[in-house]
């Protein structure tokens, strides 16, 4: 071994080292596959046996730690349950497939781990105890055995960020000295209110020992709300749910904080009332389990096509994706895009060439990880039936029927530059799809020279035509911008079953708003065609400063599609906000046709008889008028105790019409050093050294955002132009710059030359130089759809259905089945492919 020059370069890794040991860099083999994985002792990257030679060719490294996991035959550990007296840890968050989420584990397979030193190209294995191994090599191997892999480290960081927080009231509770009252830890318990017969869903108030029933559930079960009433009368702040108390966990609720909390002194508070958590067992469902049941039961039954025995399917293109912890939003998007031929060709054809010639760290190469992903999904190598369906611990909503793939490296790489997608939280699949397409678009600018296939994201791109009609002059202006997703409104007025919905709601009203256990839920049925037609409906914008007349009026704005893409993505705006700005979902059923014709949406530019809107100018020697604000929206923000200057800045940056958008802007920019500095829009175009036009003065720039972009190598003018075109969103501004990198100077020059007086925050953005896109007829056939189960995008579960070879396939994590009646009515994002004939 003294022949190997890298011996002196082998250093013992630390907790800070970037170590990948659970997934091959070039394929989805794991330590459980074949001969296991081979971990480069210098690079700390893992490879399956077939790719060790490739790594050696690139690095000239000879020494690897062979890591192999072997299942223990016929030895399975049954998870303890309520029924068998064990202590089942309940979920702490409303989520499927996460640690602390809904526990769906039935059986857990145990593994033995085996480690050996491997020498390449000698193809020689050595036991780690072999005296021939140098000490520094042995210590390095032993350390690798104990360290967490990079994916595991990122997971731990994310979970720590999502912990339940201690109550602010817990340590100040003064428990009443009631020596006569002790709670029997074994029960039975009953609500203390006379005449109340509730013996479940009971909450013990930690201050006075009062036992009260909880709230009533949506199906009519639950309690009568006596625990809440007791707090209203006494203001005693914290209660614990009886039946959920174990030595490791209890459901603790703080009434003043209106949230589930932790109590650092819970053991002390419980023993005061005679309860010893060390000997208590769980006998009731936790609040997270109950809420999950309520939110998912109805929709999940439809997604699963309840009552039907669906056939499991295997083979190329039928590979499931392991839930990495609330990663179903990512999986559903990945499955959909790789069902499209152009994505398959783009990332499969030159896969081996990319593996061979890209010298970059493979875990940091988007080209390598996308090619790896394409092969993993499409080859069929991992679409292998399990001998018995099983569920990974805290990972999947349905028993997996195949090995599938676990794209941990891909998730780590894509999420590294995004604050939300790097976490284990549930995300919006629409936002992730948009982010991924922009990521691919940027990567295509620097793709390897040997790749000749077209940029696959161009399939989705189309030119959107925006029309502005001046309310006073009737003159019009047409602009175009590049889009890749058609987002359409969901209007409840378009429901085709209004009478049935009204009858159902009246029945619910008579039942005090509680749906009976076996009562069918009636939802509004909205035709998808109505949503598409709603996209072109004009809307009125107030406080429009007309360039034609020079006075404020209103404008009528509308949009159409100037071109039709090869693949049309339709996103439903199903998610809105309650009056308190908490997100909510419109619970509707969609009427979705397999074939749609959208030719009526085509925009053809200025029409005969229309007069183009004249571009006015502003007197450069005068102060630009103070922008006006929608008083109702401004009052809404002020009522939330935001300072006036912050409210005005937020309204300027977000368009001035949406209080929720403005509120989010304020929260996102709270730490800005100039957040409370008044900025008066002054036109100083007389300064010849000023490279920004007057529109810059109407747009409030965050100086820190501008500096961040300049730090990336862009100029001040380029940074401000990008921020204007993305309404101040820093991440989108960076994306915008990279996607327009080829003609940035031209765009800046045209922007500087512009003298339009139209407030850019009140009109659609105009892209002065659009890249060409494909166009064709507007007739499309449904290719697939992504469904979301749950009440909002921050919780629940995503599933996708894809039509392959005239068969509908359901992809639910690693459970892949034929779908007999695909629940198209539950879709959130629909993919339509243009009909060739």
Swiss-Prot record:
Keyword Metal-binding: yes
Gene Ontology CC entries for this record: cytoplasm; cytosol; nucleus
SUPFAM superfamilies assigned to the protein according to its UniProt record, in alphabetical order: Cysteine proteinases, RING/U-box, UBA-like
UniProt EC number: 3.4.19.12
Domain USP per the UniProt entry, residue ranges: 319-835
A molecular-function term among this protein's GO annotations: cysteine-type deubiquitinase activity
Family: Belongs to the peptidase C19 family.
Record's protein name: Ubiquitin carboxyl-terminal hydrolase A
């Amino acid at each position: 071994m003294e022949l190997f020059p890298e011996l002196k370069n082998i250093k013992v890794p630390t907790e800070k080292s970037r170590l990948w040991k659970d997934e091959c860099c070039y394929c989805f083999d794991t330590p459980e596959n074949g001969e296991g994985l081979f971990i480069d002792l210098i690079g700390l990257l893992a490879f399956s046996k077939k790719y060790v030679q490739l790594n050696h060719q690139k690095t000239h490294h000879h020494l690897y730690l062979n890591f192999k996991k072997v299942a223990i035959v016929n030895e399975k550990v049954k998870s303890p349950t309520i029924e068998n007296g064990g202590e089942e840890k309940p979920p702490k968050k409303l989520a499927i497939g996460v640690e602390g989420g809904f526990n769906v584990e039935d059986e857990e397979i145990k593994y033995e781990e085996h480690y050996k030193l491997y020498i390449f190209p000698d193809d020689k294995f050595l036991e780690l105890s072999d005296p021939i191994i140098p000490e520094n090599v042995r210590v390095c191997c032993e350390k690798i055995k104990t360290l967490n892999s990079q994916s595991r480290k990122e997971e731990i960081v994310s979970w720590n960020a999502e912990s339940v927080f201690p109550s602010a009231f817990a340590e100040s509770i003064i428990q009443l000295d009631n020596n006569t009252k002790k709670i029997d830890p074994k029960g039975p318990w009953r609500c203390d209110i006379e005449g109340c017969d509730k013996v479940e869903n009971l909450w013990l108030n930690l201050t006075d020992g009062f036992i009260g029933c909880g709230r009533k559930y949506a199906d009519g079960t639950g309690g009568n709300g006596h625990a809440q009433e007791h707090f209203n009368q006494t203001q005693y702040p914290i209660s614990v749910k009886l039946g959920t108390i174990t030595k490791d966990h209890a459901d603790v609720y703080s009434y003043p904080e209106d949230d589930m909390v932790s109590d650092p002194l819970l053991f002390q508070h419980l023993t005061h009332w005679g309860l010893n958590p060390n000997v208590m067992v769980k006998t009731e469902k936790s609040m997270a389990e109950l809420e999950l049941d309520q939110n998912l039961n109805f929709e999940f039954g439809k997604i699963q096509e309840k009552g039907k025995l669906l056939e499991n399917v295997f083979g190329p293109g039928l590979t499931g994706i392991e839930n990495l912890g609330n990663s179903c939003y990512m999986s559903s998007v990945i499955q959909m895009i790789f069902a499209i031929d152009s994505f398959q060709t783009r990332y499969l054809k030159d896969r081996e060439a990319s593996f061979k010639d890209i010298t970059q760290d493979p875990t940091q190469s988007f080209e390598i990880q996308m090619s790896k992903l394409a092969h993993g999904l499409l080859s069929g190598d991992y679409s292998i039936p399990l001998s018995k369906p099983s569920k990974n611990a805290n990972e999947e909503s349905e028993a997996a029927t195949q090995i599938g793939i676990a794209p941990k490296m891909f998730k780590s790489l894509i999420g590294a530059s995004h604050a939300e997608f790097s976490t284990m939280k549930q995300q919006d699949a629409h936002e992730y799809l948009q982010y991924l397409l922009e990521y691919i678009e940027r990567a295509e600018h620097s793709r390897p020279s040997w790749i000749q296939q077209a940029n696959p994201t161009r399939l989705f791109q189309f030119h959107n035509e925006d029309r502005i009609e001046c309310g006073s002059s009737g003159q019009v202006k047409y602009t175009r911008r590049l889009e890749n997703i058609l987002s359409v409104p969901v209007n409840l007025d378009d429901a085709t079953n209004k009478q049935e919905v009204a009858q159902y709601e009246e029945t619910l009203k008579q039942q005090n708003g509680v749906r009976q256990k076996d009562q069918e839920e009636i939802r509004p049925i909205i035709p998808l065609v109505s949503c598409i037609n709603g996209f072109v409906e004009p809307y009125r914008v107030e406080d429009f400063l007309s360039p034609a007349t020079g006075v404020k009026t209103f404008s009528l704005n509308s949009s159409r599609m100037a071109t039709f893409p090869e693949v049309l993505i339709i996103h439903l705006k199903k998610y809105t906000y309650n009056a308190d700005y908490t997100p909510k979902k419109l619970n509707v059923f969609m009427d979705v046709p397999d074939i749609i014709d959208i030719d009526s949406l085509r925009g053809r530019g200025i029409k005969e008889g229309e007069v183009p809107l004249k571009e006015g100018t502003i007197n450069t020697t005068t102060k630009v008028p103070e922008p006006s604000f929608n008083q109702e929206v401004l009052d809404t923000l002020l009522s939330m105790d935001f300072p006036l200057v912050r409210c005005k800045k937020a309204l300027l940056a977000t368009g001035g019409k949406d209080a929720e958008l403005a509120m989010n802007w304020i929260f996102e920019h709270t730490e800005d050093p100039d957040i409370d500095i008044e900025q008066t829009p002054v036109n100083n175009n007389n300064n010849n050294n000023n490279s920004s036009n007057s529109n810059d003065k109407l747009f409030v720039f965050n100086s820190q955002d501008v500096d961040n972009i300049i730090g990336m190598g862009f100029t001040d003018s380029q940074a401000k132009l990008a921020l204007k075109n993305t309404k101040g969103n820093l991440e989108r501004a960076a994306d915008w710059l990279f996607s327009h990198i080829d003609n940035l100077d031209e765009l800046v020059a045209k922007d500087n030359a512009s003298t339009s007086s139209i407030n850019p925050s009140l009109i659609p953005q105009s892209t002065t130089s659009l890249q060409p896109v494909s166009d064709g007829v507007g007739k499309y056939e449904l290719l697939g759809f992504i469904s979301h189960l749950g009440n909002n995008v921050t919780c629940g579960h995503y599933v996708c259905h894809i039509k392959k070879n005239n068969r509908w396939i359901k992809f639910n994590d690693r459970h892949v089945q034929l779908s007999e009646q695909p629940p198209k009515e539950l879709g959130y994002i629909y993919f339509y492919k243009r009909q060739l004939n």
